[in-house]
């Protein structure tokens, strides 16, 4: 019977050799400890058999749990197994057919005890384990069924640690099934911010809101885009094509284009071609983008002016677009009902560094508005002017905004002019290039350039003036140059400067004053040139000066209260006499008393 028992003992010893006990990755204090193997029979940590009846002491304060450690698996081909079986997944085995350094689960290393070769084991290369430690001095004898060791912490204190079989550390995470149904939900629940914006699957709104970009559709290419209103950026005012037009935002923008080679850009640049501003349709409402080919959602752009294609004729690029004006009629939540465009064209000389200044106007009005009402200018206040709104002028029965000179990129006078804004002082100038002509023609041309076409005759007193009611407009006073002051008989007197002087004041309640125009005067400054002198270029200047002549009334005062008082010394004679009588007491009789007695005596005589 002894032979089978010895054989079983040998197998048991082979399964649990002395050198394969668990090695901790950290001590209870967090530092790498120095391990000391406990020999059988030593006090304070001997591993006892479960058959022994010796019990351990009760748990003492100060028990700590060491961070789970990893155990070295056995090498393939060697029948001797390690304390724990080999990991099913070796995450650090990155080189097939070769041993990865510090990868304790790499079968290509063929190491029975990798810890004896490697300085440490990479995370994930051994199974996780847990250690529970107490001070070694508290343990006399241990009969724990789990492996135990004594470690030396960083402070030199010996710790008795027991390896606990914590199976939860080696559980596998259950995989979630991902399909087309739950993919988006899982990505939204567990995902974070993305570098790219997520696709918005929500349907477009059913109608435009104020400020929304206006959608356009190009049937030829089946492309949806936005209605653009180029605006000037930078000091040079270069055209920015990406500026979208906002719904119900009536405004005007101006920008400048420079051409390196105008000869090639003349017919190829779409910004110069009139067709690019009306060869598309406008979507009536935003939800039309779901079915843009449906004619119910498309509003064609109607051309209301003559427009020709650009043409390069010799050294001139003809029919280039200089002004674009959109008139858009809307009907509340029913969207855009009608769109019309009028174009202004000019000619450019082909030369190095040629430039073009373009003006873009967008105007919204209510659908089915009468033609007569649509011609009138928008109000600049109701009733009083609002600072920054256009100063309204009148010529005949047509009202419009008063304008100033505007210069192009090369300094020459532009056909597009600045609006005069109420309450805003301004100055502008440009150079007018003229051909040699007689004096009267020069004067007429320069006058029209200074005050604009047509010439303003009246200015609105209030911002809501009606052109049909002449009483709401004040006549413009003109002060021309003094011709008699010129001594030269062969000279031509031409205007070079116009100052627009506007006198205004606040009227009405102090709590809600309204600004109104009291008077306007055009003051011209001139200079003389000889008729024989060939005038080719004249520098012109316009100035706007607003003068506040408000005279604030005195604040109201209450009526004075009646306070009747007698003079301070009204009873002076009687008071003095009475005071003397009192002071004399027994010395003499008061003169007042004597006077009274005399009066009584006289009265008695008359009665008798």
UniProtKB/Swiss-Prot annotation:
This entry carries the following GO cellular component terms, namely: membrane
Disordered: where is this region?
Answer: 23-58
Which residue ranges run through the membrane? 587-607
A GO biological process of this protein is: apoptotic process
InterPro entries per UniProt: Tectonic, Tectonic_dom
Superkingdom assignment: Eukaryota
Topological domain (Extracellular) residues are 23-586
UniProt topology in membrane: Single-pass type I membrane protein
| Subunit structure of this chain's protein | Part of the tectonic-like complex (also named B9 complex).
Name of the protein described by the UniProt record: Tectonic-3
């Amino acid at each position: 019977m002894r032979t089978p028992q010895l054989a079983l003992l040998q197998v048991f010893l082979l399964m649990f050799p002395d050198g394969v006990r668990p090695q901790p990755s950290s001590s209870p204090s967090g530092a790498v400890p120095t391990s000391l193997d406990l020999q059988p029979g030593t006090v304070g940590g001997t591993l006892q058999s479960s058959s022994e009846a010796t019990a351990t002491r009760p748990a003492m304060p100060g028990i700590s749990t060491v961070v789970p450690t990893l155990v070295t698996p056995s090498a393939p081909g060697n029948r001797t197994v390690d304390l724990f079986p080999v990991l099913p997944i070796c995450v650090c085995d990155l080189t097939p057919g070769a041993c990865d350094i510090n990868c304790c689960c790499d079968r290509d290393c063929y190491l029975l005890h990798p810890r004896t070769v490697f300085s440490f084991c990479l995370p994930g290369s051994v199974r996780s384990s847990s250690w529970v430690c107490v001070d070694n001095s508290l343990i006399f004898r241990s009969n724990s069924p789990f492996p135990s060791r004594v470690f030396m912490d960083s402070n030199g204190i010996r710790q008795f640690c027991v390896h606990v079989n914590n199976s939860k550390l080696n559980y596998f995470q259950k995989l979630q099934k991902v399909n087309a149904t739950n993919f988006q939900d899982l990505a939204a629940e567990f995902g974070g911010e993305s570098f790219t914006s997520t696709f918005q699957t929500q349907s477009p709104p059913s109608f435009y809101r104020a400020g929304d970009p206006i959608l356009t559709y190009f049937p030829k290419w089946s492309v949806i885009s936005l209605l653009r209103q180029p605006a000037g950026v930078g000091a040079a005012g270069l055209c920015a094509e990406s500026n979208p037009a906002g719904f119900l935002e009536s405004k005007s923008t101006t920008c400048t284009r420079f051409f390196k080679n105008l000869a090639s850009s003349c017919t190829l640049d779409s910004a110069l071609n009139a067709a690019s501003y009306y060869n598309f349709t406008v979507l009536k409402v935003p939800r039309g983008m779901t079915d843009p080919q449906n004619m119910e959602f498309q509003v064609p752009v109607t051309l209301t002016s003559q427009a020709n294609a650009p043409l390069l004729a010799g050294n001139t690029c003809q029919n280039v677009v200089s002004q674009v004006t959109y008139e858009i009629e809307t009907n509340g939540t029913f969207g855009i009902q009608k769109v019309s465009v009028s174009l202004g064209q000019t000619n450019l000389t082909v030369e190095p560094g040629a430039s073009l200044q373009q003006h873009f106007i967008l105007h919204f009005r209510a659908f089915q508005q009468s033609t007569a009402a649509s011609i009138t200018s928008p109000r600049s206040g109701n009733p009083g002017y609002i600072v920054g709104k256009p100063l309204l002028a009148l010529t005949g029965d047509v009202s419009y905004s008063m304008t100033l000179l505007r210069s192009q990129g090369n300094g020459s006078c532009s056909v597009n002019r600045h609006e005069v804004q109420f309450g805003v002082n301004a100055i502008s100038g440009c150079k007018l290039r003229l051909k040699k002509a007689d004096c009267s023609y020069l004067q007429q041309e320069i006058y029209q350039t200074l005050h604009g076409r047509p010439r303003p005759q009246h200015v609105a007193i209030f911002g809501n003036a009606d052109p049909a009611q002449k009483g709401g407009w004040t006549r413009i006073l003109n002060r021309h140059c003094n011709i008699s002051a010129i001594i030269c008989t062969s000279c031509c007197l031409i205007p070079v400067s116009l100052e627009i002087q506007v006198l205004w004041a606040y009227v009405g309640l102090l709590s809600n004053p309204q600004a109104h125009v009291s008077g306007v005067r055009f003051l011209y400054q001139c200079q003389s040139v000889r008729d024989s002198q060939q005038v080719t270029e004249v520098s012109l200047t316009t100035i706007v000066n607003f003068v506040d002549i408000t005279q604030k009334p005195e604040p109201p005062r209450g009526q004075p209260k009646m306070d009747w008082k007698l003079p301070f010394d009204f009873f002076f004679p009687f008071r003095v006499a009475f005071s003397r009588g009192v002071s004399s007491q027994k010395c003499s009789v008061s003169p007042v008393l004597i006077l009274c007695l005399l009066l009584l005596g006289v009265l008695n005589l008359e009665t008798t």
